[in-house]
């Protein structure tokens, strides 16, 4: 499979309806970070396992209110906002689809919206949205994000 945004999003759509399974990383069940990791691995992209680790690879994007600076395929992260000198707490991740929509695993894999007028509006996750991460330009250029060809765990023996 190609390592481009449209191909990755197409793969994510094939996961819709798969049940939530804590620590799951297969078509039998996934958690939020397992969905992201599995979709990307199907495109030969290896990223860290947990959302709290995935949040700190690539380029952090502070999301504007109109989402104009977020691109399809960016990862969107959720959790506890930073306060009193404490760093934010990452607890959830999804893949941004454009038009204020994102795909994620919570209950099952489905599409939610940040837009209050949409039928699939997700007030809970909108309220805990933290930032986005752009990762594709950084594959094989940054530690923790590479292809199997550049990962020592996948080199031929």
Regions found by a protein language model. Give the residues of each.
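Flexible, substrate/cofactor-facing loop regions flanked by secondary structure
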Residues: 21-23, 37, 46-52
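Extracytoplasmic/periplasmic, Sec-exported soluble proteins
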Residues: 4, 27-31, 65-68
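Active-site nucleophilic cysteine motif
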Residues: 12, 24-43
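Generic hydrophobic alpha-helical scaffold/packing signal
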Residues: 37, 74-77, 133
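...with weaker cross-activation on analogous glycine-rich loops/strands in unrelated enzymes
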Residues: 47-112, 116-117
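Aromatic- and glycine-rich peptidoglycan recognition patches
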Residues: 88-157
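Second-shell loop/turn segments in exported
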Residues: 19-27, 83
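Boundary regions of SH3-family modules and the immediately adjacent low-complexity/disordered segments
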Residues: 1-11, 15-18, 109, 144, ...
